[in-house]
Amino acid sequence: MQSWSRVYCSLVKRGHFSRISHGLQGVSVVPLRTYADQPIDADVTVIGSGPGGYVAAIKAAQLGFKTVCVEKNETLGGTCLNVGCIPSKALLNNSHFYHLAHGKDFASRGIEMSEVRLNLEKMMEQKSNAVKALTGGIAHLFKQNKVVHVNGYGKITGKNQVTATKADGSTQVIDTKNILIATGSEVTPFPGITIDEDTIVSSTGALSLKKVPEKLVVIGAGVIGVELGSVWQRLGADVTAVEFLGHVGGVGIDMEISKNFQRILQKQGFKFKLNTKVTGATKKSDGKIDVSIEAASGGKAEVITCDVLLVCIGRRPFTQNLGLEELGIELDTRGRIPVNTRFQTKIPNIYAIGDVVAGPMLAHKAEDEGIICVEGMAGGAVHIDYNCVPSVIYTHPEVAWVGKSEEQLKEEGIEYKVGKFPFAANSRAKTNADTDGMVKILGQKSTDRVLGAHILGPGAGEMVNEAALALEYGASCEDIARVCHAHPTLSEAFREANLAASFGKSINF
């Protein structure tokens, strides 16, 4: 009977039996756990299919590596495509159209409408369709590039092995030469406040509210806070953002741009309480929430009552249960995985990119790291200049920047010059009746080299890429000023700001 026991256990492990009716006399019962019949052999195994992970997997396959991508969620694309960048941009775009139609903007353009009605369900449907199309697109790209997709929770179970645990408890083992961790990040919890994604929500819940709240309080006036706050403010909510810092827009934004940005948002109806901290939140019997706040430095307490509380205090690396401790890979004080310039951990064939390593938590930063990392695996050069990674806030007007801010240049003791140009003096902005904001260029005083570009205005998120290219190739302000820009375009404001920085005077202002 002992030999039967061994055979039975082996068959159960391989998934051939889930149970044997009435048992076998003398055979001990073993827990059900099924395994794939054969491990998968791979050159590169990527854990995570967000912007960094899926791009890295495709690039690895294109370079000739046998590639596997392990993803714990049912759909590919990670936070960005499913509950982040993509759905938020759909809502930002559509809420902006509604705001224009519902307010006085359309009437001022000669477009008169008898009734404008919000169909929130339809708006959410359009958002979901965009997400579905893009996540499905990644699945198609995986097939096209012969990337093997394994759906399951990936854990590193050896320096050359990843085990994916599927929803049904079965596992798939991947024997691999290289491992790339691209597991992204998760919402940072607020101490003492429990997120239920109903009335106390994270960014995920804020993307799927069933109705427009009468009053919305946002904890945090960084990028995510002002974007999602703008969505619901445009759709009719009374929105107040409570920010611990003394400015809006988060880390890295130029202070002059931030002040102008805040002024424009306030003109739209967005309210801010800066230098203020949230000390707690209590749900009342009527379903509303009392949010307790006070000055960041301490002081008199105040209570704001709202229908929905949105917590936007940042994100933290997602590294739990990856098997790092067992491998001796220690995290830094901020929970990130330490890597060298080739994105290698202390174990040379295990790499990490994106939100789990140092640097800004941006999708495009993760994409760049993913491509460069696998090129390095193939023997290529590995280089990325984080000073050339742009940041964008997709409100209206948009805010975008790349390179150094004035505050950073002052802190580093670098002598610089400034060139500015307002969109109010730009012909295309005038014809569009969309003139809020400006372009601000920072150039090195001694060399004229572009050190930073800060844009507040329509199309800023597109325009900043011209600035990123200039920084990447070491262009001077004069170089940009002498490039012919099409007329009439918003990008002429970028040229004019560089004219002002290089020659001390723009043409049209």
From Swiss-Prot:
Residues with the N6-succinyllysine modification: K66, K104, K122, K132, K143, K159, K166, K273, K277, K410, K430, K505
Broadest EC class assigned to this enzyme: oxidoreductase
Signal peptide location: none
Enzymatic reactions: N(6)-[(R)-dihydrolipoyl]-L-lysyl-[protein] + NAD(+) = N(6)-[(R)-lipoyl]-L-lysyl-[protein] + NADH + H(+)
InterPro entries: Class-I_Pyr_Nuc-Dis_Oxidored, FAD/NAD-bd_sf, FAD/NAD-binding_dom, FAD/NAD-linked_Rdtase_dimer_sf, Lipoamide_DH, Pyr_nuc-diS_OxRdtase, Pyr_nucl-diS_OxRdtase_dimer, Pyr_OxRdtase_I_AS
GO-annotated molecular function: branched-chain alpha-keto acid dehydrogenase activity; dihydrolipoyl dehydrogenase (NADH) activity; flavin adenine dinucleotide binding; pyruvate dehydrogenase (NAD+) activity
Cofactor: FAD
Binding site for NAD(+): G220, A221, G222, V223, I224, G225, V226, E227, E243, V278, G314
Matching Pfam families: Pyr_redox_2 (PF07992), Pyr_redox_dim (PF02852)
Main location per the UniProt record: mitochondrion
Similarity comment: Belongs to the class-I pyridine nucleotide-disulfide oxidoreductase family.
Assembly: Homodimer. Part of the multimeric pyruvate dehydrogenase complex that contains multiple copies of pyruvate dehydrogenase (subunits PDHA (PDHA1 or PDHA2) and PDHB, E1), dihydrolipoamide acetyltransferase (DLAT, E2) and lipoamide dehydrogenase (DLD, E3). These subunits are bound to an inner core composed of about 48 DLAT and 12 PDHX molecules (by non covalent bonds). The 2-oxoglutarate dehydrogenase complex is composed of OGDH (2-oxoglutarate dehydrogenase; E1), DLST (dihydrolipoamide succinyltransferase; E2), DLD (dihydrolipoamide dehydrogenase; E3) and the assembly factor KGD4.
Name this protein carries in UniProt: Dihydrolipoyl dehydrogenase, mitochondrial
Source species of the chain: Bos taurus
